[in-house]
Amino acid sequence: MGSYALPRSGVRRSIRVLLLALVVGVLGTATALIAPPGAHAAESTLGAAAAQSGRYFGTAIASGRLSDSTYTSIAGREFNMVTAENEMKIDATEPQRGQFNFSSADRVYNWAVQNGKQVRGHTLAWHSQQPGWMQSLSGSALRQAMIDHINGVMAHYKGKIVQWDVVNEAFADGSSGARRDSNLQRSGNDWIEVAFRTARAADPSAKLCYNDYNVENWTWAKTQAMYNMVRDFKQRGVPIDCVGFQSHFNSGSPYNSNFRTTLQNFAALGVDVAITELDIQGAPASTYANVTNDCLAVSRCLGITVWGVRDSDSWRSEQTPLLFNNDGSKKAAYTAVLDALNGGDSSEPPADGGQIKGVGSGRCLDVPDASTSDGTQLQLWDCHSGTNQQWAATDAGELRVYGDKCLDAAGTSNGSKVQIYSCWGGDNQKWRLNSDGSVVGVQSGLCLDAVGNGTANGTLIQLYTCSNGSNQRWTRT
């Protein structure tokens, strides 16, 4: 993970306690639906619950926060695996060539071991967070420096680290499927293979992982490029044991239900998989539960690491992406994850799905052609029993279709299209369902509107200033 591990385009089930409901009549009163409580937890902490299936649930630890008693209390109680957030990276462990400094890394390692936790090593070879002396090298000199660094760090921790992220973030973003243009890549295309072979010789007992971000969606070129590399390595006997999926989910790289397929396909190559740096903008409980269940569904998924303890500890704290609030209190996402780990599938959408019918048209809110593609604009269509007209209200204020797609506003101005998009917890996917029949976007303050007061099949849906017109009033059927 690095300071740029998210795309620059921007950043996009909990316990079923209170589900927002749409009005039953035009001027009816909205009814709150109370769902049965979830299954009782067999274990009361994340690590213990994960251990029931032979997995771990870990967190990233920063040495500078180990004097914070709230931080260490939560981390000590909840997690059974630790990753040093920055302390084992290249600039921290070898600030001068050949002069290793493990003081901060050892502080994290020792705290973990003293508190009964295992440790993941992160990371040995990476284009980022290189000390100045390494940045100035190239070619064979850089290659030798990489080898020496791997040997030096792994010798210090030999037999102590259960998994190492040997290589981090070597593939380019976008649709090219190419390697990232870095100083390490320019030292020769075999640099990743050399790093893994060096690491195996340095510590045969550690699992050796490749780690990257934006590789969770099976259809993406970057994912396919990583898959092809791992397949090639396995075919040729290059010692790779596991693949880490960072899972920094956001609007530019949202959670997709095919993540489970991705994990399964990599596991089928004969490697373990792990979710290594999980954080999700807005911490939607349903998405956290889905990710947890994806890991649980794949026998070779070793476990999950969240990238920080509280929101205030996160590298993206303004996006509130973790399981604990700034004050250390648990979020709904925490409960959803714990329930999933304890065997209760919290990822199922609320069981209150139904049609949303326009008062003026008598037609239903419809996803054209039952499309599941993000960005598909909604329309009016004759009501029927298809899943593309079944909308479930969640306690987070979402309106979901197909379980993992949300009613989504593409903008905040009049005329902005209303579409489906993978649920990610943003305010543009949250709606107020009012007793007058209006459906108002939380982010925009505008109403769900049938374009041009239209009533015919195919009339598109947009946002527009609320007017109490019949094209802006809806009932639940």
Swiss-Prot record:
Q: Which residues form the GH10 domain?
A: 42-340
The organism's lineage?
A: Bacteria, Bacillati, Actinomycetota, Actinomycetes, Kitasatosporales
Family according to the record: Belongs to the glycosyl hydrolase 10 (cellulase F) family.
Query: Major location, coarse class?
Result: secreted
Recorded hits in InterPro entries, A to Z, give: GH10, GH10_AS, GH10_dom, Glycoside_hydrolase_SF, Ricin_B-like_lectins, Ricin_B_lectin
Which PANTHER family does the entry link to?
BETA-XYLANASE, GLYCOSYL HYDROLASE
Q: Which PROSITE patterns match?
A: GH10_1, GH10_2, RICIN_B_LECTIN
Catalysed reaction, written as an equation: Endohydrolysis of (1->4)-beta-D-xylosidic linkages in xylans
| Disulfide bond sites | C364-C383, C406-C423, C447-C466
Record bears the keyword Ligase: no
Native organism is Streptomyces lividans
| Localisation | Secreted
Q: Where is the Ricin B-type lectin domain?
A: 361-477
User: Looking at the UniProt record for this protein, which Gene Ontology cellular component terms does it annotate, in alphabetical order?
Assistant: extracellular region
- Annotated function: Contributes to hydrolyze hemicellulose, the major component of plant cell-walls. XLNA and XLNB seem to act sequentially on the substrate to yield xylobiose and xylose as carbon sources.
**Which pathway is this protein engaged in?**
Glycan degradation; xylan degradation
Molecular function GO labels = carbohydrate binding; endo-1,4-beta-xylanase activity
UniProt-listed GO biological process terms: xylan catabolic process
Which residues constitute the signal peptide according to the record? 1-41
Enzyme Commission identifier(s) = 3.2.1.8
- Give the Gene3D superfamilies listed for this entry: 2.80.10.50, Glycosidases (3.20.20.80)
Question: Which residues does the Swiss-Prot or TrEMBL record annotate as the active site?
Answer: E169 (proton donor), E277 (nucleophile)
The record's CDD domains line, in alphabetical order, gives:
beta-trefoil_Ricin_XLN-like
Major enzyme class: hydrolase
Q: What is this protein called?
A: Endo-1,4-beta-xylanase A
